[in-house]
């Protein structure tokens, strides 16, 4: 009890941080009242010798340590990890939340092997010893968290409500049962209120975090979804309010959580890492927090019992049986998950306790509670409860590998769908809330990447068995895949089958396009670590407050998301405001050794961001996407379409690889995207398709496209853009050619994010979607003109029309034109792709023919007023005018006409010829451009209609002249003029007689004076009427056009 003397002061700070906690009973160490009787912090059923009981601050010693027999579980974890479990740092009594060297009675806690069986705190001891460094921060939850480690030792009857454990090593059940007893009953009201009020609920907050999935977990679960949801909303608000504070709070809360988790040696190891990472996370240190990777897993947030379980869930996979094996994995989760609010329990739970309970059980702890606490609340709670948050930082230092896991410690309440390892475990309200997202993650990547990203940094640290047992990698991949799937809905689904319990379909339906865009960007960035530094910096700056400790690895994992954020600061702000949690969740899976996970992580984090962004206007979404994927967006879309075409039209699959035309066209974007894709391809050499998409020969791309068509691993870009729930897999197939596997697809997603988002938002206007439309048009054109396009890679990709129109000899030119057109100054082509009988049109230019073919291909808009239709009108009008001119010229030759009449004839013919040679020609080219999907300034049908209306004025003017000539001819070429005109003409005749040339114009002017006035009046009326009609048409269609035009422009601009 030598430490008992020192402990009081610290315990006063830590154990007694929250009056509520200390009101229950006195902390033996600090003398503050403890919640023992209520069981909030006291671990029910944990009996310690008088000293132990005293030493252990029931409030702060989340009886997980008490429950856990260190002998049973602690030894292996310690020896295995040797971080927090093995090294008995100042032997903090698990019972002592003080985090100080525990009293003598706490020895059992300190030494798992030495732990007395009566003290189920033994496992926690190792954790307290190793973990309690963070404990000082919030020793209550930290130590308590540690307790659940030894589920076997845990006493289900222990007073510590959270410490109720089934005799078996139930991952969540341990903590859930332990805290379920009294804590759940008591803490929920107190802690929930406190957290909701942002009151420092250190112990309660930890209690909430300690919320388990056992009987208590079930109870909490039932109430946690609504309660946690409410808490999550509150936390999100707090999170938004205190992004900057979140960094510190996260660090503190995470560190504390790590402490709490240290109870379990496995957890203790992770707790240590998490402590460091957590404290860093909670603190705006900009350091990646290993716990973050654990924290960031949606599982953490999804688990209503313990958000901290994300890593712990991962660890828990194998931790129950291999509790010692995944201390590493748990450390990060613990540190990250230190402070969480249980859905059912308003109090903050000890993430460590939850993690401890969690670890034994393969099930994933519910993570909604922590997300409720999340950064802002946990931050405050940790500030008050974790005086020694710096200690976790030390642990975090020891857990550098876990820092990547710390990338995103944002509560994943919205992400709830990260059942880290517990696919079997349903994600309570979190999953329900973000079920679609979770399902997106869970369906394809849940099993693979749920935990993988979390322990990605740890994966190096953790033994492969640990990773496997914990299933962290698969979880990380699942998460990554989930995000990718959310981004590229289709591929993710099959990829995340292991985590099918994540019902991501709705989430995917919400965010899948946006997530795809994000994933595409994130993956592109993650894939090309080239942009990692850049994205890291961006991401840091944007999310530093939120991801203070995510710096090193969160940045790596979220490098592309950083770019994405850079792309869309407004979106970033929105994410930080409401989706920081998502971001924080993302990083934990980012560092996973799985490149796909990293990409997915980035993509996921944006996917989560997308959850809100999807509402963001396509322009906003497109801009951010385009910033990174401006070119890739186009090219992804184009690629996807061309892949689709290539797949459908094997003749030019390689050409479909001309996808990278847009890359060529967009140098900066191309450089970035190429780097990203190249990096992705390099990372996924097996998926050389990715690099081949950009860099590899088209043959590879074609083969990959074919493979992807088979595998449905579509490039997210196009898939997402056009995919928006409508053609998820068709696009997917198209892009599938681009990306052979999900990771490649992730790259694709990044590339075509802009288009994806844009198309998703306006998929209804998909035909008018510029980027997507251009790409689709190219695809259709290519299909329509396989013969034409197969010869030119880029041209083929975007269709012969692109080649024809831009006539770039180089793929880059095509790509540039195509990209610009695709992103679309004009969406005309689709609108104007009316099935036109080319025979009726004037001979179209070579490039025009493919456009016609495209129209025939079926890409023409339902509206027949497209370029072909106007060309028909123009052709008919030209023939009519030419007939008039020929007729009048013949009349002038055959008849001896007066100069005045000849002047009229010349005027009419000249006007007609001028009209035909200039305006008609201009309109003709406009129509051709409209039909040319590759036309950079592709006019819309509304543009053509407006121009045609203008032409009608000139045509009417010329027609009036010819009508007058016709009347003169019918009058035997005798001037038939009204008296006024005759009078006027009498005056002018001398002028006409003077110089024929001068006379001609003068005569024309005078002769046209009255008619001109009349014509001008009629013209004005006609113009007004036509303008009104055209305005209505244009306003109706141009709203979409302008949106499409501007959205693509937004994409092109950024």
UniProtKB/Swiss-Prot annotation:
User: Highest taxon of the source?
Assistant: Eukaryota
Give membrane topology per the record.
Peripheral membrane protein
One of the GO BP terms on file: modulation of chemical synaptic transmission
Q: Where is the composition biased (Basic and acidic residues)?
A: 977-987, 1002-1020
- Here the segments flagged for biased composition (Polar residues) are 242-255, 628-641
Q: Which UniProt keywords apply?
A: Cell membrane, Membrane, Phosphoprotein, Synapse
Q: Which residues carry this modification: Phosphoserine?
A: 298, 304, 386, 452, 662, 665, 668, 715, 740, 771, 806, 978, 1007
List locations, semicolon-separated: Cell membrane; Postsynaptic density; Synapse
Tissue specificity comment: Expressed in brain and kidney.
Q: Where is the composition biased (Basic residues)?
A: 267-281
Phosphothreonine, modified sites:
738
Q: What are this entry's molecular-function GO terms?
A: molecular adaptor activity
Q: Give positions of region: Disordered.
A: 32-87, 242-301, 442-464, 609-666, 719-746, 977-1021
Q: Which GO terms describe its cellular component?
A: glutamatergic synapse; neurofilament; plasma membrane; postsynaptic density; postsynaptic specialization
Regions of compositional bias (Low complexity) in chain numbering = 289-299
Q: Give the function comment from the record.
A: May play a role in the molecular organization of synapses and neuronal cell signaling. Could be an adapter protein linking ion channel to the subsynaptic cytoskeleton. May induce enrichment of PSD-95/SAP90 at the plasma membrane.
UniProt similarity note: Belongs to the SAPAP family.
What does the subunit comment say?
Interacts with DLG1 and DLG4/PSD-95.
Q: What is this protein called?
A: Disks large-associated protein 2
Source organism per entry reads Homo sapiens
Q: Which gene encodes it?
A: DLGAP2
